[in-house]
Structures are given as structure tokens and as C-alpha cells.
């Protein structure tokens, strides 16, 4: 697992905090943040209409943050989600979302897997 320097980690945490507030305005209930497994981390786990949303938050100013979610990152997320569900509720309905934060604006991309 790669560790970010304090400046990058602080920026990421700030983006995640803002993302949680944005998601609440859309009717999401925050379940958990920064869930870790040996495979990786899920930034935000939220519930809406009975569906768990595993949300990757990406922020950036000088590039399009969506490109930071690679096929490799998605595979790690899926393995981490399996760990979470096996510990909590294996029968939960779920989807994987991305929340892009760029220049103070939010864009929620739901169900990003192929």
C-alpha cells in the first residue's frame, strides 16, 4: 500500500469530508469511511434506498481526476468490497461509485464498473 505525504493526505481527507457533506444533500446516509483491507481502501461507504454505495473520492485541479481510477484500482476496490461484505452483510445490494471533486464542484458517477 502506498502512503501519501501529509500534505496529500490532508488534501484527500478534506475532499472526502466535503464529499460526505455533498452526498448527504443527495439523500445518502454515511455508513463508514476509510474502510481498509489487505487489498486496499474504500473512501466512503454510504446507504441510499437500501443499496450500499462504495464510493471512491478523487480530486484534482490540474487534471481530470476520473483518470486516477484505473482498472487495477477497481480490482482492488472489488476485493476490498468483498472483505467488507463478508464481515458485515454478504447479501447486501451494492454498487461502486466515483465522486469527482474538481475546482470546488462535485460530480457523482454511479455504478462505474463495466
From Swiss-Prot:
Xref: Gene3D superfamilies: 3.40.1350.10
Domain of life: Bacteria
Species per Swiss-Prot/TrEMBL record: Helicobacter pylori (strain HPAG1)
Name of the protein: UPF0102 protein HPAG1_0809
Transmembrane segment boundaries: none
GO function terms (MF aspect): nucleic acid binding
Listed NCBIfam families: PRK12497.2-4
Family, similarity comment: Belongs to the UPF0102 family.
Amino acid at each position: 500500500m502506498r502512503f501519501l505525504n501529509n500534505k496529500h493526505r490532508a488534501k484527500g481527507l478534506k475532499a472526502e469530508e466535503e464529499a460526505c457533506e455533498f452526498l448527504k444533500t443527495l439523500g445518502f446516509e454515511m455508513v463508514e469511511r476509510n474502510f481498509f483491507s489487505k487489498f486496499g481502501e474504500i473512501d466512503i461507504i454510504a446507504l441510499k434506498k437500501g443499496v450500499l454505495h462504495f464510493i471512491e473520492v478523487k480530486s484534482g485541479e490540474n487534471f481530470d481526476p476520473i483518470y486516477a481510477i484505473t482498472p487495477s484500482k477497481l480490482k482492488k476496490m472489488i476485493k476490498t468490497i468483498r472483505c467488507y461484505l463478508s464481515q458485515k452483510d454478504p447479501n447486501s445490494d451494492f454498487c461502486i461509485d466515483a465522486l469527482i471533486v474538481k475546482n470546488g464542484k462535485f460530480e457523482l458517477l454511479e455504478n462505474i464498473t463495466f
